[in-house]
């Protein structure tokens, strides 16, 4: 899907937008614009304004018709969603009333052979959500075997990561690995699967994609930025698609919705006021009809929270995840 499609209904879209509870005059951020599905649903509420963000220039260009239709109610920004606070500042917005995030790779990216995200098509081994920076082919060509194994294990949750890394290093000595089909075939030779299992290369592709786009760093930064710009009573709705993403969202909201433990020596100083109130303790998941219509919905989880009036907490000083630049320079 190359344009914002009026027929496109995002995974858990109605549930996520209902969680936002858009109101007339409110300003909302669709932090992962994609095909424009969440934005269209928000704009159905009269008098709402949407800021749509996407790092993919194809998504932004594809939203031109929706911008023409919505007029001043819709502004599209090509950027990473971790830059929410800076984007708001550049638009003169001190606060917004709601933020929706649909984390990870989009369907239109997965379905494009030229983008190199999927082993279902033979294409260049790219995997970048934007147009700049190293590709997955660069990682496969340059990363040390140990680093490849760590990436595939940590980000892909692949228990055969060391065997996969060895196979990649052996194969790249014979010829450059530049296509999705090449990589998928290499992985399939060392990761065995039974009928009904996921494709043997699924987890390896996930691990490389997450590293190339630094997706988990981005998510952590975006959640912290959302905390900074949401008005009291503003709502955050996040749809995630695998356990690493969901764990980050769940942990962030759990930490921000509880009172700090305090200290018997300095109880007043140590105590932190909750910055969010949970809207759901258990994640919302897709029903069977949605899963049948869109199999990708099977793993989707929706979590939400409402911003309190407490001051935002300081963002994390540094990331604990492997960094792309470090991997490419060998540590």
Swiss-Prot record:
Binding site for S-adenosyl-L-methionine: 36-38, 54, 81, 102, 109
Domain of life, source organism: Bacteria
A molecular function (GO) term: rRNA (cytosine-N4-)-methyltransferase activity
Gene Ontology cellular-component terms listed: cytoplasm
Keyword check for Manganese: no
Cellular localisation: Cytoplasm
InterPro entries, sorted: RsmH, SAM-dep_MeTrfase_MraW_recog, SAM-dependent_MTases_sf
Pfam families (alphabetical): Methyltransf_5
Region annotation Disordered: where it falls in the sequence: 287-331
EC number(s) per entry: 2.1.1.199
Enzyme class, first EC level, given as a word: transferase
Name of the molecule in the record: Ribosomal RNA small subunit methyltransferase H
């Amino acid at each position: 899907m190359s344009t914002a499609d009026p027929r496109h209904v995002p995974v858990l879209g109605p549930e996520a937008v209902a969680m936002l509870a858009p109101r007339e005059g409110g300003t909302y951020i669709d932090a992962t614009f994609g095909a424009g599905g969440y934005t269209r649903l928000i704009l159905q509420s009269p008098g709402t304004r949407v800021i749509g963000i996407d790092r993919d220039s194809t998504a932004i260009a594809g939203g031109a018709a929706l911008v023409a239709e919505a007029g001043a109610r819709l502004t599209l920004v090509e950027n990473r969603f971790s830059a929410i606070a800076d984007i708001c500042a550049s638009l003169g917005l001190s606060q917004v009333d709601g933020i929706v995030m649909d984390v990870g790779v989009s369907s239109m990216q997965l379905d494009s052979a030229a983008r190199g995200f999927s082993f279902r098509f033979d294409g260049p081994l790219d995997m970048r959500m934007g147009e700049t920076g190293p590709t997955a082919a660069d990682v496969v060509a340059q990363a040390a075997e140990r680093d490849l194994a760590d990436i595939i294990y940590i980000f892909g949750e692949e228990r055969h990561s060391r065997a996969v890394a060895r196979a990649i290093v052996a194969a790249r000595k014979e010829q450059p690995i530049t296509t999705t089909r090449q990589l998928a075939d290499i992985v399939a030779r060392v990761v065995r699967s039974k009928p009904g299992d996921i494709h043997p290369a699924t987890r390896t592709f996930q691990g490389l994609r997450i590293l190339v786009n630094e997706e988990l760093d981005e998510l952590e930064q975006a959640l912290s930025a959302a905390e900074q710009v949401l008005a009291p009573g503003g709502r955050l709705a996040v749809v995630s698609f695998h356990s690493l993403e969901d764990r980050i969202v769940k942990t962030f909201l759990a930490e921000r919705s509880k009172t700090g433990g305090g200290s018997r020596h300095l109880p007043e100083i140590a105590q932190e006021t909750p910055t969010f109130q949970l809207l759901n303790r258990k994640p919302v998941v897709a029903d069977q009809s949605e899963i049948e219509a869109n199999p990708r919905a099977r793993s989707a989880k929706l979590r939400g929270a409402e911003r309190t009036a407490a001051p935002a907490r300081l963002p994390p000083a540094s990331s604990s995840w492997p960094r792309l630049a470090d991997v490419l320079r060998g540590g």
